[in-house]
Each structure stands twice: as structure tokens, then as C-alpha cells.
């Protein structure tokens, strides 16, 4: 069975509609409901696509002015991202039930203090020092904050005398992480299990509203008894500790002002809030930083796993691949893992309408596809099987971290039952749930990167890319190595996006003998996200170039047919019939196209000359076997062959050169491949027009007449534009448009 692209518009299957479609709920033809297992049917509720679309819409609502409500149970990952990255408004649920729940918990603690009860963290020391006792809970709170303010931070904003080995600011966390942590800690405290006052939660909201954010050390948490040290800097800001630094004011050149928390609070008319009783411990004993960084990571990860499917669809088009690899029978019927089914369905639908991908598979005879690749290679053909498990792991992690932000009880110790007054000593601060979510997310990101790297390196390799030039060069390859550097860079990216594990060490007098390292794991996942984004941006850049080259090929081949027809008539028309001319043209066209596919490493003139020379064997075979009349003189025939070859070579070379020039310099418009692409078209057009990454090759075409960097920016600068569009969320709106 071979492949035929002659009926691209026909439906592959005419099956009943499936349980869900491109938006996660609407059926799409081809995926048969009766074929799905029970596990697969749950995908309608938990697909990566539906979660991505829901999160995107929610985030847009917050960006457009909707306030995030802190009520202890409805905080979403999108809400964390909105507060952390877009300074969205935050309001507390001030309903009587919620406020009473907090009040009862605080009263329970006050009663224990007044009666002299022994309660961990109020009358005892901490961790391995819990055998000490004191009746001074206020001073104990100061001692707690003091011993946790141990992080390394820049001591000055002035330039260093000696150039640092790394960014001097890389010892502190990004503000987004800290804002997210404040929000999540508020959401935990408002549940009323921590014995704190309502006014403390209000003060934390006030910090967010004023955008006064503590400078928090990047390192120092093992996320065992919560993220103790990072959270202590939030507590230090609340009380106005003059030694705690905070960000404040408008951003200048991307950097905000830094000042003493005491001075900045006064500048913003915010009263310091002295902490009482259990409140220092209530702030510190929690997983807020781990959950914040994890939530921000997953908000990006779920986008990237969908973008990977879009890249795979575009790669299928660029490599003239087949949609049949994603047929419903293979996935929804034969092996219905939910992630695999979702991935196959998405790619199947994205390829709809493509004039490059082969949309149908037909039976052909053995001799018709002899010596041709029978099927797509693994990076395309098995992409649903490879990406599917990653989708499932990211969905699972998404749900776990959402739960961590909400539905678990407070994550400090002890927990206070306001209804009974009981205190419960446990370990909800142990953030292993977040760690596991991040480990599986990071492993998933690595696998996504590995798949896309394999697709990318196949696309730039002339031995594998089905007739594209080496390194997707738009001009003569002897002086154009366009994507060769990218092939190396993407290898580096996928190597750096390693899922390397975290290593637990016993800590704090062996009291914390096991610890989750959740924040460390989440930080590593953020790094993996950044590296994977670099890889995806590079691949998208290569894909757009490859699609333009395919469009050029689609224009060149009809032009070549005209040249063959006209030169056959000129050289052999006097002694060949119309039928013979037609047959000969078919033979020559087949031979020339086969030659062009195998000679993409040659420069244009040499390539067309050797292509024309292959006509000798075709012509000899034709005149020997067809019984065609030939000129009485063999010299006349040889002269006709020579004239034909020379004219074909010259005209073909000129045609290719003209098309190259028109494509490179925009005479065909900024998006010449649009007419050939399926539903991935908006991504290609966004890159080419909205962010202005045009086809590469102008400097090479003009033989570097003006030097480097005059006619075009560097390859890396163009990829940086794509990278930034992914990181700042602009690409998300394009991906939504593909599926919504």
C-alpha cells in the first residue's frame, strides 16, 4: 500500500462522531465513541486541550479586570499566573462563614496560650529543638524569623568591582514566584486551620495591591517543613523588618527599585503588622513557594505540550508526511490511551485541508512505490504514542498542583480545628506531592524536547527531508549553511532539558530526615521550560523556512513542466507525434523530479545541468523502445538531444533563481506558503507577519555584498522573537485560535 495525495479534500473515514473534539467537548468526525475505553472517555473532562483553553479564558478574564477571589477552595493555576505575572486584582471572600472560620481558629490558639498549654511552635522550640520550652510566644516568633533569615542576596545595587561569573541578581527569586506564593499562602490561611488573625490575611493582600514584594533568596529551602526560609521574608516584610529588602515602584528598564521594607511600607502608607502567637509559624509552615513555582511552570507546560502537537502537524506538512499515522483506528480503537488519543486527534484535525501532507492512503502496486519510503519515520509516525504519556503526566501534575493550592487543609503545623479547639500535630508541610508533580512534568518536557529535536534534525538533513535543501538553505548550499548552527543548538537544548532528579539530604539535626525538595524541583522545571521553549522557537523558525521552500517547489515543478514541453517541441517536434511527445514528457518529468530530490546538496546551475543530462538515458530508451521515427542522420539526433539538454538546464536554472529571489525578497508576499498549509496556517502567518520573521537568505542571495547584519538580523535574533512570543503569552492566543 503506497501513498497518494491526489484527493486531499476527501474524508479519511466516515465514522460516527466522537466523544470530544478540538475544544475537548465537541465531537469531531473520525473518532468513534464506541471504540473508546472507559479511561479514554474521561478525556472529555481532563484533556490537556480543555484544561489549556479553560485556563487561557480564565487568565484573559483576570487580565481584563476580573478580580481573583481568595476563599480557600477555588484558586486555579490560571489565577496564580494572573496575580503573579499580570498584577491582577485580588480580593478576599469576606463572607461571615469564612471570617468566622478564621476567628474560631485564632480563638482556639489564644485560649491555649492563656491557659499555659504546651503547643508546638508556641511554647516549644522548633524541629529538632522541640524539647525546649518557653512561655514567651511573641519572642519565640522573633527567634523563628531570625534563624530563617539566612538567604544569600546582593548587598548592594551598585555595579560590582569584579565582573561576576553569573548574573549578580541570580541569587534572588523572580518577583512572579513571590507574588504567587503570597497569594497561595493567603488562600491556605483563609481556610481557618492556622490560628492566625483575619487582619494578617488582609495585610498580605495589601502588599499585593501595593506591589510591595519582598526580595527572597533563590536557594535555601528543602520544602520539608514547608518553604521556611523563603516564607520568612514575607513575614519580615509584614512586620517592617528594616533589614528585609523589598521591590517597589514602577519598573525602570525592566528593574524595579529596591528598598528597606520599613521605609517602603511607610512610603506606601502601609502600617507594619506585628505578629502574635502562632502567626510567624502560620506564615512559614507552608508549601506556598513550591506550589507557586509549580503552578507557574504548569501554566506554561500545558501550553508547550499543545504547541508540540502543532509543531508535529507543521512538520508533517514540511516533510510531505501522511495524516494516516494519526488515523482513529490506530489510536481510538486499537490502543486508546487517553493522551495518545487526544494527541492523534489534534494532529489529525490540524492537518485538515493541507495541500502538502498526504491526507489519504491508497493501495498501489508493488512497482509503483518501489524504492520509496513506505511510511513516515518514527518522529512523525509515532508522535501520538510518544507525546501521549507526557500529556497524561502533565494533566496529572496540573490537577495535583491545583489541589495543593486549594483543597488540601492548611500546610502548617500544628493545625487548629476551630470547632473543637483541638490542635493536630502532623506534616502537611511535606511537599512531596508537588515534587512528584514537578518530576513527572520535567521528565515529560524532556521527552517532548527529544521528539521535536528528532523531527527538527530530520528536517534539515537532505538525506531524510524528502527533497529539501540541506539546512533548509534558500540559496546555493555551497555558501549557505542556514540551519546548521541550529541543528547544533537544538542538540544542546535537548541535552540541557534533562529530567535529572533531586537528591534528598537529611537536615536540621536529622529531624527532617526526609524532605521533598519541591521548590528545588520546581525551579529545575522552570529551567527545563525555558530550554524547551528555546528548542520549540528554533524548530518553528526552521518549519516556516521549510514550508516556504515547499511552496517554492510547488511553483517550480509546473514551470519545469512547461520548459520540458516547449523544449521537446523545439528539439523533437518535427519527427514525434503528439502522443509520443506526451509519453516522453511524462518519462522526463518523472526522471527529473527524482533527480531533483536526490541532488539538493548541489548548487543551482550544477544541479540543473546534471538534471538535464539525465535525459540522455530516458531519450535513448524512448527512441529504442517506442518505434518513434528518428532523423535520418544520427548527428541530427545527437544535436537535438544536446540542444534540448542545454536549453532545459539554462531555463530551469533561471526559473529557480527567479523564484528564489521572489520568495526571499517578498515578491510573493510575506506568507507564500499559506495556500498550501492546513489549520496550522495561523502560526505560520503569526511568525511571518505579526512578529516579522521573514524568510532567510537575502544576504546569501546577494553574496554578502553589504556584509553581515545589514540586510537582515541574525538568525538568533529572529528566533528570539519567536521565543519571546511564547514566553510572554502572545503565541497562546494563536494556539487557542487553532482549537477554539
Swiss-Prot record:
UniProtKB keywords: Cytoplasm, Lyase, Phenylalanine catabolism, Phenylpropanoid metabolism
What are the record's GO terms for cellular component? cytoplasm
Per the record, the domain of life is Eukaryota
Active site positions, chain numbering: 120 (proton donor/acceptor)
Principal localization reads cytoplasm
Keyword Cytoplasm (UniProt): yes
**InterPro entries noted in UniProt:** Aromatic_Lyase (IPR001106), Fumarase/histidase_N (IPR024083), L-Aspartase-like (IPR008948), Phe/His_NH3-lyase_AS (IPR022313), Phe_NH3-lyase (IPR005922), Phe_NH3-lyase_shielding_dom_sf (IPR023144)
Is the Signal keyword given for this protein? no
Subcellular localization, as worded in the UniProt entry: Cytoplasm
Specify the pathway. Answer: Phenylpropanoid metabolism; trans-cinnamate biosynthesis; trans-cinnamate from L-phenylalanine: step 1/1
Q: Where does (E)-cinnamate bind?
A: 285, 375, 381, 413, 484, 508, 511
Q: Post-translation: what modifications?
A: Contains an active site 4-methylidene-imidazol-5-one (MIO), which is formed autocatalytically by cyclization and dehydration of residues Ala-Ser-Gly.
Q: Where do we see the 5-imidazolinone (Ser-Gly) cross-link in this protein?
A: 224-226
Q: Provide the E.C. number(s) assigned to this enzyme.
A: 4.3.1.24
Q: How does it assemble?
A: Homotetramer.
Protein family according to the UniProt entry: Belongs to the PAL/histidase family.
What is the protein named? Phenylalanine ammonia-lyase
Mind giving the lineage of the organism this protein is from?
Answer: Eukaryota, Fungi, Dikarya, Basidiomycota, Agaricomycotina
Coding gene? PAL
Amino acid at each position: 500500500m503506497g501513498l497518494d495525495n491526489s484527493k486531499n479534500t476527501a474524508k479519511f473515514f466516515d465514522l460516527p462522531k466522537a466523544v470530544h473534539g478540538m475544544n475537548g467537548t465537541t465531537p469531531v468526525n473520525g473518532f468513534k465513541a464506541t471504540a473508546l475505553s472507559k479511561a479514554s472517555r474521561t478525556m472529555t473532562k481532563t484533556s490537556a486541550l480543555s484544561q489549556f483553553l479553560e485556563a487561557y479564558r480564565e487568565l484573559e478574564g483576570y487580565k481584563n479586570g476580573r478580580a481573583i477571589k481568595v476563599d480557600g477552595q477555588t484558586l486555579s493555576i490560571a489565577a496564580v499566573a494572573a496575580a503573579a505575572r499580570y498584577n491582577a486584582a485580588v480580593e478576599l471572600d469576606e463572607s461571615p462563614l469564612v471570617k468566622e472560620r478564621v476567628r474560631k481558629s485564632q480563638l482556639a490558639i489564644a485560649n491555649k496560650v492563656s491557659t499555659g498549654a504546651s503547643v508546638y511552635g508556641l511554647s516549644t522550640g522548633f524541629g529538632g529543638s522541640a524539647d525546649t520550652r518557653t512561655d514567651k510566644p511573641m519572642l519565640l516568633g522573633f527567634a523563628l524569623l531570625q534563624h530563617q533569615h539566612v538567604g544569600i542576596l546582593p548587598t548592594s545595587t551598585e555595579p560590582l568591582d569584579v565582573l561576576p561569573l553569573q548574573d549578580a541578581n541570580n541569587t534572588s527569586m523572580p518577583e512572579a514566584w513571590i507574588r504567587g506564593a503570597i497569594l497561595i499562602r493567603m488562600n491556605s490561611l483563609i481556610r481557618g486551620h492556622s490560628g492566625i488573625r483575619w487582619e494578617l490575611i488582609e495585610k498580605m493582600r495589601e502588599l499585593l495591591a501595593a506591589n510591595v514584594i519582598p526580595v527572597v533568596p533563590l536557594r535555601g529551602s528543602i520544602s520539608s517543613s514547608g518553604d521556611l526560609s523563603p516564607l520568612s521574608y514575607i513575614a519580615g516584610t509584614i512586620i517592617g523588618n528594616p533589614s528585609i529588602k523589598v521591590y517597589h515602584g514602577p519598573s525602570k528598564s525592566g528593574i524595579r527599585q529596591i528598598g528597606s521594607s520599613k521605609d517602603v511600607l511607610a512610603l506606601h502608607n502601609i502600617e507594619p503588622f506585628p505578629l502574635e502567637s502562632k502567626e510567624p509559624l502560620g506564615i512559614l509552615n507552608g508549601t506556598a513557594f513550591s506550589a507557586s513555582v509549580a503552578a507557574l511552570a504548569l501554566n506554561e507546560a500545558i501550553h508547550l505540550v499543545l504547541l508540540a502537537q502543532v509543531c508535529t502537524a507543521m512538520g508533517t506538512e514540511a516533510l510531505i508526511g501522511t495524516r494516516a499515522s494519526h488515523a482513529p483506528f490506530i489510536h481510538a480503537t486499537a490502543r486508546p490511551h487517553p493522551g495518545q488519543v487526544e494527541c492523534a486527534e489534534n494532529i489529525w484535525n490540524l492537518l485538515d485541508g493541507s495541500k502538502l501532507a498526504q491526507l489519504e492512503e491508497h493501495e498501489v502496486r508493488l512497482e509503483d512505490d518501489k524504492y520509496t519510503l513506505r511510511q513516515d519515520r518514527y518522529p512523525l509516525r509515532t508522535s501520538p504514542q510518544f507525546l501521549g504519556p507526557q500529556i497524561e503526566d502533565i494533566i496529572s501534575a496540573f490537577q495535583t498542583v491545583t489541589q495543593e493550592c486549594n483543597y488540601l487543609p492548611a500546610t502548617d503545623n500544628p493545625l487548629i480545628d476551630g470547632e473543637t479547639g483541638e490542635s493536630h500535630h502532623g506534616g502537611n508541610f511535606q511537599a512531596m506531592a508537588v515534587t512528584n508533580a514537578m518530576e513527572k512534568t520535567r521528565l515529560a518536557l524532556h521527552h517532548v524536547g527529544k521528539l521535536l529535536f528528532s523531527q527538527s534534525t530530520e528536517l534539515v538533513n537532505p538525506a531524510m527531508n524528502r527533497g529539501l535543501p540541506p539546512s533548509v538553505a534558500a540559496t546555493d548550499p555551497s555558501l549557505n549553511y542556514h540551519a546548521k548552527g541550529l541543528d547544533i543548538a537544538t542538540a544542546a537544548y535537548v541535552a540541557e532539558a534533562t529530567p535529572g532528579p533531586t537528591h534528598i539530604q537529611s537536615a536540621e539535626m536529622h529531624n527532617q530526615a526526609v524532605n521533598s525538595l519541591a521548590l528545588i524541583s520546581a525551579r529545575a522545571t522552570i529551567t527545563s521550560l525555558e530550554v524547551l521553549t528555546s528548542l520549540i522557537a528554533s524548530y518553528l523558525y526552521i518549519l516556516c523556512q521549510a514550508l516556504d521552500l515547499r511552496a517554492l517547489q510547488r511553483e517550480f515543478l509546473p514551470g519545469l513542466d512547461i520548459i520540458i514541453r516547449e523544449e521537446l517541441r523545439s528539439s523533437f517536434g518535427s519527427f514525434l507525434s503528439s502522443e509520443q511527445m506526451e509519453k516522453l514528457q511524462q518519462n522526463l518529468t518523472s526522471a527529473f523530479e527524482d533527480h531533483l530530490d536526490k541532488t539538493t546538496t548541489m548548487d543551482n546551475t550544477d544541479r540543473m545541468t546534471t538534471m538535464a543530462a539525465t535525459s540522455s538515458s530516458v531519450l535513448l530508451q524512448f527512441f529504442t523502445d517506442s518505434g518513434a521515427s528518428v532523423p535520418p542522420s544520427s548527428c541530427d539526433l545527437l544535436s537535438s538531444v544536446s540542444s534540448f539538454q542545454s536549453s532545459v538546464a539554462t531555463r530551469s536554472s533561471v526559473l529557480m533563481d527567479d523564484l528564489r529571489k521572489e520568495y526571499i525578497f517578498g515578491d510573493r508576499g510575506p506568507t507564500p506558503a499559506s495556500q498550501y498549509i492546513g489549520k496550522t496556517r495561523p502560526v505560520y502567518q503569526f511568525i511571518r507577519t505579526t512578529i516579522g520573521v521573514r524568510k532567510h537568505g537575502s544576504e546569501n542571495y546577494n553574496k554578502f555584498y553589504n556584509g553581515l547584519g545589514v540586510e537582515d538580523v541574525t538568525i538568533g535574533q529572529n528566533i528570539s522573537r519567536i521565543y519571546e512570543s511564547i514566553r510572554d503569552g502572545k503565541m497562546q492566543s494563536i494556539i487557542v485560535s487553532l482549537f477554539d
